Amino acid sequence: MNFERLEAIAYKAMGKRKSHVEREIGHVFFHGKRVSNSVLLLRKTIFPEDASHDEILRCAGLFHDVGKGIEPHARTGAVLARELLKEELTESELNAVCEIISVHDDRHPEDDRYSPWIKLLQDADHLDHFGSQGLWLSFTYRAYMGQKDMTELPAFYESEWDESIPRTRSHLNFDFSRKIFDEKVRYERDAISRLKLESEGFYI
């Protein structure tokens, strides 16, 4: 696969698009780029001897959210990706990429119907919403929604965010993914603890 061309196609489709009112322009493009890298990190750690699907994973990561904003976005995205990539991939590559895209949001860790490649992409996608990126999403969301003071953010983390963590963790497919997730969650909690302190005028 020619990833220089694929990235150009992805940018044209997503780079200047706003998928949701509370997200920055191009969010899904940059999210896809990160996922296309992190899914390979997961594969190299979890299945170190099998690089057979690396190009498929990388391409699926890049385009997995191309349907974002048109629900069900995974299945819509598979249709859009097939059209966008029909001149770039072989039929078997196209089928494999679109299969991953079509079910990347159907998370059932105990279900064996999905291949390890699908599960890797699912985990990479989930993990990109936490850690530094999680903080960015929280700040930009509140900015777009008109919240003017950072003192409001810790309350969200102490309620909705905290309540969502066990559920999100349960959707991850691999122990290594859960390890990364736990580290990202710790990082966010520490950052918000410091933010809460400083938002009230304290430092220590």
Regions found by a protein language model. Give the residues of each.
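Amphipathic, well-packed alpha-helical segments that form the structural scaffold of globular domains
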Residues: 11, 15, 37-40, 44, ...
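His-Asp-centered metal-binding catalytic motifs of divalent-metal-dependent phosphohydrolases/nucleases
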Residues: 52-73, 77, 97-107
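An active-site-proximal "capping" alpha-helix that borders the catalytic cofactor pocket
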Residues: 35-36, 73-87
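Short alpha-helical hairpin
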Residues: 1-18
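Membrane-interface starts of transmembrane alpha-helices
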Residues: 90-95
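Divalent metal-dependent phosphate-bond-processing catalytic cores, especially two-metal-ion Mg2+/Mn2+ enzymes
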Residues: 5, 20-49, 89, 110-204
